[in-house]
Curated annotation (Swiss-Prot):
CDD domains noted in UniProt: Argininosuccinate_lyase (cd01359)
Gene Ontology biological process: arginine biosynthetic process via ornithine; L-arginine biosynthetic process
EC number(s) recorded for this UniProt protein: 4.3.2.1
Residues forming coiled coils: none
A single MF term (Gene Ontology): argininosuccinate lyase activity
GO cellular component assignments: cytosol
Protein name from the UniProt record: Argininosuccinate lyase
Family designation: Belongs to the lyase 1 family. Argininosuccinate lyase subfamily.
Protein's gene: argH
Cellular localization per UniProt: Cytoplasm
Length: 459
């Protein structure tokens, strides 16, 4: 038997089965159930307080919603596709439970402002969760920086060895990136944390409602000033998806680093066994599946951003049913980014650096820049110094030798300005600690950065 539509008074025919199947959103928007109930309870309390409905009915509504909330939490609630969405399912269940009083809940409210209120409550909570997860990740990166401050490794440009750095400098680089990600989400909260309820379908409400009361009940810091904007705008969700995409890009870069560094060709990093998988045929394999999936899921989040941008780009004001398609991309991105941050955090916490391998790789021709700087400090124009040291590198490469093997006599063949102290520059630790500029890889700079982040993250 087909359920009677709550909006069916104007129609002479039952809804076609195809339309019910095509337009339903309950298969995914039940994610909003608890947020919808929270919004409805605040609305009901306000209706009773304002005398718009009898206080007794308001109390019945709140009690009925609390019962439904418990059923949902216990997975006992029966969802009906023919009731279209989460909001209609809950309202119908409420009316069945408490009778005519349930029909008064929708007084002074439209599904348009109801839906977007639940959506904002959902996004507000999950954005704060993401901020907290990012901060936990930052703490793990800070711990790794402290653990490996006395380990050197090569920094890469073009995936070629560039210059030696302290490993702590590498971990602090990602800590900085995730700080900006976190700040973007924090800033996004300002535009999420706005109450749309009370805007009605599009033009406002002709009952003496108290939006300030509802905002306080629901914990919103602001009330949206324009009813058209409140019910039809999704820029806050687009901003959220953009932030997710940028954050996923940073996590994908870290994942790529770890995939490369944990390969046998590099062997810089040992990943925890419990966070890797094996092969069905090759017994020696230790696959970085978590990292690979984070790298792969990044494209999925990009797609979600493009999906919603495409939905909203041609919509006239105000609400259009197209906006039903805002939920899927956001729900999927929330699940994806939260899982990815947790995965990266576990990887960071459990990884171990191979000190011997990283130190060996940090030497060699990665030290060449400092020989050029040595000559520049003695008055040689840097471009000329660069050419001289390039000739030294070519000389050694042709002999199959590393830079550390060169003697002072050989250096003097290329420039008489080389002295005994130039040989000290053939140590990656010495070279790293020459980078004393603010933000550099010298130990004194790294200790200063660690002190700074300790105050920020562990206050």
């Amino acid at each position: 038997m087909q359920e009677k539509k709550l909006w069916g008074g104007r129609f002479s025919e039952s809804t076609d089965a195809f339309v019910e199947e095509f337009t339903e959103s309950i298969s995914f928007d039940k994610e909003l159930a608890l947020y919808d109930i929270k919004g409805s309870m605040a609305h009901a309390k306000m209706l009773g307080k304002q005398g718009i409905i009898p206080q007794e009915d308001a109390e019945k509504i709140v009690k009925g919603l609390q019962d439904i909330e418990q059923e949902i939490k216990e997975n006992k609630f029966v969802w009906k596709k023919e009731l279209e969405d989460v909001h209609m399912n809950i309202e119908k269940a409420l009316t069945d439970k408490i009778g005519k009083a349930g029909g008064k809940l929708h007084t002074g409210r439209s599904r348009n402002d109801q839906v977007i209120t639940a959506f904002r409550l959902y996004l507000k909570e999950n954005t704060q969760d993401i901020i907290n997860l990012l901060e936990d990740l930052q703490r793990k990166l800070l711990e790794k920086a402290k653990e490996y401050i006395d380990v050197v490794m090569p920094a890469y440009t073009h995936l070629q060895r560039a210059q030696p750095i302290r490993a702590a400098h590498y971990f602090l680089a990602y800590l900085e990136m995730f700080q900006r990600d976190k700040e973007r989400f924090i800033d996004n909260l300002k535009r999420i944390d706005m109450l749309p309820l009370g805007s009605g379908a599009v033009a406002g409400v002709d009952f003496p409602i108290d939006r300030e009361y509802v905002a306080k009940e629901l914990g919103f810091s602001q009330i949206m000033r324009n009813s058209i904007d409140a019910t039809s705008s999704r820029d806050f969700a687009l901003e959220f998806l953009s932030n997710c995409a940028i954050c996923m890009a940073n996590m994908s870069r870290f994942s790529e680093d770890m995939i490369i560094y944990s390969s046998s060709e590099f062997s810089f990093v040992e990943l925890p066994d419990k966070l890797t998988t094996g092969s069905s045929i090759m017994p020696q394999k230790k696959n970085p599946d978590v990292l690979e999936l984070i790298r792969g899921k990044t494209g999925r989040v990009y797609g979600n951003l493009i999906s919603l941008l495409t939905v909203v780009k041609g919509l006239p004001l105000a609400y259009n049913r197209d906006l039903q398609e805002d939920k899927g991309p956001v729900f999927d991105s929330v699940k994806t980014i939260k899982g990815s941050i947790i995965g990266i955090t576990k990887i960071v916490e459990g990884l171990k650096l191979n000190r011997e391998k990283t130190q060996l790789a940090a030497g060699g021709f990665a030290l060449a820049t400092d020989l050029a700087n040595y000559l520049a400090e003695k008055g040689v124009p840097f471009r000329q110094a660069h050419h001289i040291v390039g000739s030294i590198v070519g000389y050694l490469v042709n002999q199959g030798r590393e830079l550390e093997s060169i003697t002072l006599e050989e250096l003097k063949q290329f420039s008489h300005l080389f002295e005994e102290d130039a040989l000290k520059l053939l140590s990656p630790f010495v070279v790293a600690d020459r980078r004393k500029s603010f933000g550099g890889t010298a130990k004194e700079q790294i200790l200063s950065q660690i002190e700074y982040w300790d105050k920020i993250l562990n206050k």
